[in-house]
A protein has these predicted regions:
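Secondary-structure boundary/capping motif
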Residues: 71, 93, 133-135
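Protruding loop/beta-arch "assembly-hinge" segments enriched in small, turn-prone residues
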Residues: 1-6, 126-151
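Short, surface-exposed, polar/charged, turn-prone segments marking secondary-structure boundaries
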Residues: 58, 97-101, 123-127, 138-143
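Solvent-exposed edge beta-strands and adjacent loop segments
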Residues: 2-71, 110-131
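Extended hydrophobic/Leu-rich segments
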Residues: 17, 29, 99, 145-146
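Acidic glycine-/aspartate-rich tracts in secreted/extracellular proteins
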Residues: 73-78, 135-139
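Short acidic, gly/pro-rich beta-turn/loop elements at beta-sheet edges
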Residues: 78-80, 106, 121-123, 140-143
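Short, acidic/charged, Gly/Pro-enriched secondary-structure junctions
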Residues: 74, 79-114
Length: 151
């Protein structure tokens, strides 16, 4: 069997950064365990009589809805997770950047922290569950998709 070697992206090599709203996030969140970038698009119904006669609804893609979910370990004096917690408590935006590798693809921009939940199991580590939604605080730093070449 011959062919090209397959290079997989491993979660442990992915990166999450936080920073001051309005600027690119540069502080790595090292105690993040699981991070997910979740995207959906609105479905706009454009059914007309022609499609209806064929028995189908027709749709167009609408605006994208993006969330970042983060599972992190609660570690004393962790400045990066502390900055995210402060953003939640003060209802202030925070800059986040998620990459699927050290120089991979992902998303960056300003986000609001809508959910900040702390789990305290009797027989386990304290974990934090965070959900972030994009916002805009500065016209020069809108939420942006990052591809392999744009960094």
């Amino acid at each position: 069997m011959s062919g090209n070697a397959v290079t997989y992206r491993l979660g442990r090599n992915c990166k999450l950064y936080e920073g001051t709203a309005g600027a690119e996030a540069t502080t790595e969140v090292t105690h993040a365990a699981d991070v997910a970038t979740n995207g959906t698009r609105e479905r706009i119904n454009i059914t007309d009589r022609q499609l209806a006669a064929l028995g189908f609804n027709g749709y167009a893609s609408g605006l994208a809805d993006l969330t970042i979910t983060i599972q992190a370990r609660r570690v004393a004096n962790d400045a990066a997770v502390g900055a995210i917690r402060t953003a939640f408590k003060s209802a202030s935006p925070i800059s986040l950047k998620v990459l699927n590798g050290a120089t991979g693809e992902g998303v960056k921009g300003d986000f609001v922290i809508s959910d900040y939940n702390e789990s305290q199991p009797i027989n386990g580590a304290v974990d934090i569950s965070i959900t972030a939604y994009p916002t805009i605080t500065d016209d020069s730093f809108p939420p942006t998709w990052i591809d392999e070449t744009s960094g």
